[in-house]
Amino acid sequence: MLTADDKKLLAQLWEKVAGHQDEFGNEALQRMFVTYPQTKTYFPHFDLHPGSEQVRSHGKKVAAALGNAVKSLDNISQALSELSNLHAYNLRVDPANFKLLSQCFQVVLAVHLGKDYTPEMHAAFDKFLSAVAAVLAEKYR
């Protein structure tokens, strides 16, 4: 459960991400495909080469969904309900992959934000990403 301090840190973090979220989403996906190549199986129709417009577009969607969830910290489940349905019923993505993408997004933030990505912010974002992954996986049960 996110505390009031976590929510404050997440708002501060997303202010730092604003303006770069599309780039960060793209980098997180690219990093995931390199680090965890098995995740490519969910994107057979995508050009997965670096700089691919399809990956860039999907990264933009990932970052937008995270931004939407940051704005809805008191009801992440409702904010991501449609995405949860899509991933569970249509795309049938293994929920373990949400954690892989979360790790990659964390690395991208650490690389780009450096010292501005404090340990406290990292911990709050980790809790947030765990909540997002749980919401995206809740329809699988």
From Swiss-Prot:
GO cellular component: blood microparticle; haptoglobin-hemoglobin complex; hemoglobin complex
InterPro entries: Globin (IPR000971), Globin-like_sf (IPR009050), Globin/Proto (IPR012292), Hemoglobin_a-typ (IPR002338), Hemoglobin_oxygen_transport (IPR050056), Hemoglobin_zeta (IPR002340)
Residue positions binding heme b: H58, H87
Paired cysteines (S-S): none
The keyword Metal-binding is assigned to this record: yes
Tissue specificity as recorded in UniProt: Red blood cells.
BP terms from Gene Ontology: hydrogen peroxide catabolic process
Highest taxon in the source lineage: Eukaryota
Keyword annotations: Heme, Iron, Metal-binding, Oxygen transport, Transport
Similarity remark: Belongs to the globin family.
Function, in words: Involved in oxygen transport from the lung to the various peripheral tissues.
Subunit record text: Heterotetramer of two alpha-D chains and two beta chains.
Protein name: Hemoglobin subunit alpha-D
Source species: Anser anser anser
Lineage: Eukaryota, Metazoa, Chordata, Craniata, Vertebrata
